[in-house]
């Protein structure tokens, strides 16, 4: 399939459409594991959460714990219950499961005045935080691109940011959001924004 782009090309990433909710947000220094099949999504979510004061446990520690327990977490055939169990073993309270669905096409870009072929993408990023002890989903967010884009790393990062911002209540669900939430060109949340007040939670929830 060959698509065509007008004057603006595919470089600019439009504000994605989002949905999300939270029942409670993590207290500062909550330990979490970000788990998913795409390293770029995991990295973007980890960076965003670190900026919000969440302590992110590296996936390699979970994989090591799984190897010690002779549990397979590689590929796409793993059980989420095993991930939760291994995350608990390494001291995490939350597992943030990330999922990205990416489609790609060859497109003709006329933005320079001359047609040239390039690969463009559309994507949906979904994340949800699960308590390792109770299995409760504490928050969940999803962001879907509204236009095709050419920079897959920037696109996935921006979608991850908007999905998380919606889950945490920093932007409303839908297709409209302040530019300061996830500034274009950065793909990461603005550091100028003050974090929301975390919901009151039992003292034990931060462990």
Sequence positions of predicted segments:
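C-terminal/domain-edge helix-coil "capping" segments
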Residues: 1-30, 40-41, 86-90, 102-105, ...
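N-terminal segment of the mature soluble domain
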Residues: 28-99, 132, 136-140
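Surface-exposed beta-strand edges and their flanking turn/coil or helix-capping segments
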Residues: 47, 69-72, 110-111, 142, ...
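N-terminal post-signal-peptidase region of extra-cytosolic proteins
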Residues: 76-84, 107-116
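Charged, amphipathic alpha-helical segments
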Residues: 92-113
């Amino acid at each position: 399939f060959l698509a065509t782009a007008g004057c603006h090309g595919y470089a600019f990433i439009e504000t994605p459409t989002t949905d999300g909710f939270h029942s409670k947000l993590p207290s500062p220094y909550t330990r979490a594991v970000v788990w998913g099949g795409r390293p770029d999504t995991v990295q973007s979510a980890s960076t965003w959460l670190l900026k919000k004061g969440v302590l992110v446990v590296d996936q390699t520690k979970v994989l090591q714990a799984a190897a010690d327990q002779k549990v397979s977490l590689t590929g796409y055939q793993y059980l989420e219950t095993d991930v939760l169990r291994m995350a608990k073993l390494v001291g995490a309270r939350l597992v943030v499961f990330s999922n990205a669905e990416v489609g790609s096409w060859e497109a003709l870009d006329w933005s320079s005045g001359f047609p040239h072929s390039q690969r463009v993408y559309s994507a949906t990023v979904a994340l949800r935080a699960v308590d390792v002890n109770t299995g409760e989903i504490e928050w969940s967010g999803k962001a879907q691109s509204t236009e095709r884009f050419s920079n897959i790393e920037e696109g996935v990062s921006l979608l991850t940011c908007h999905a998380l911002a919606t889950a945490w209540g920093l932007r409303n669900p839908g297709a409209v959001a302040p530019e300061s939430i996830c500034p274009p060109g950065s793909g990461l949340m603005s550091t100028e924004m003050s974090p929301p007040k975390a919901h009151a939670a039992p003292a034990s929830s931060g462990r």
